[in-house]
């Protein structure tokens, strides 16, 4: 959000509650510190229908599902698009370590700069309509650079936050 603010974008913080209730105080504090609005969108039922139930069914059938890819395509980006459309917002930004490239009117997902943290696989199923609106500023940096930059800019708590490692 801070990177985008410095690039001149008007930013709104959006958190999706998909599985369990989380302590959102850190997110709220960050939005307050940045002086940007904060919204929380509930998506428990959609998440259960589109991710959890198919995951369990596939796993019981002996398959190895990829719930993060499904969640991004069928839940997270759908909800973010709904929020953006409701607010009349043109772009949807996330903290994924990927880059979006455009060539001849078609958008492509590219690996992020950091080979250790590239997340392009997780967004492979996004349609062109969403890729066209996507901003992924962290894809141009390594995770280490982002954490150092956050700490230097007064976001030490964010810089020290434990990484997400998979299923939610």
Segments the model singles out, each with a brief description of its role:
Residues 1-125, 135, 143-146:
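ATP-dependent adenylation/nucleotidyltransferase module used to activate substrates
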Residues 118, 122-168:
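Contiguous mid-protein beta-loop-alpha structural module that forms a pocket-lining wall or clamp
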């Amino acid at each position: 959000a801070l990177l985008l603010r410095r690039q001149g974008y008007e930013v709104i913080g959006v958190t999706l509650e998909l599985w369990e209730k989380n302590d959102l105080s850190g997110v709220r504090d960050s939005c307050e510190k940045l002086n940007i609005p904060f919204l929380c969108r509930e998506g428990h039922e959609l998440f259960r229908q589109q991710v959890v139930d198919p995951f369990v069914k596939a796993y019981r059938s002996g398959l190895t599902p990829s719930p993060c890819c499904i969640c991004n395509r069928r839940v997270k980006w759908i909800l973010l698009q709904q929020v953006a459309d409701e607010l009349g917002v043109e772009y949807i930004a996330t903290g994924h370590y990927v880059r979006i490239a455009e060539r001849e009117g078609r958008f492509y997902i590219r690996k992020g700069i950091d080979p250790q943290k590239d997340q392009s696989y997780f967004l492979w199923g996004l349609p062109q309509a969403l890729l066209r609106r996507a901003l992924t500023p962290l894809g141009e940096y390594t995770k280490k650079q982002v954490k150092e930059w956050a700490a230097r800019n007064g976001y030490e708590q964010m810089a020290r936050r434990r990484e997400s490692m998979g299923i939610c």
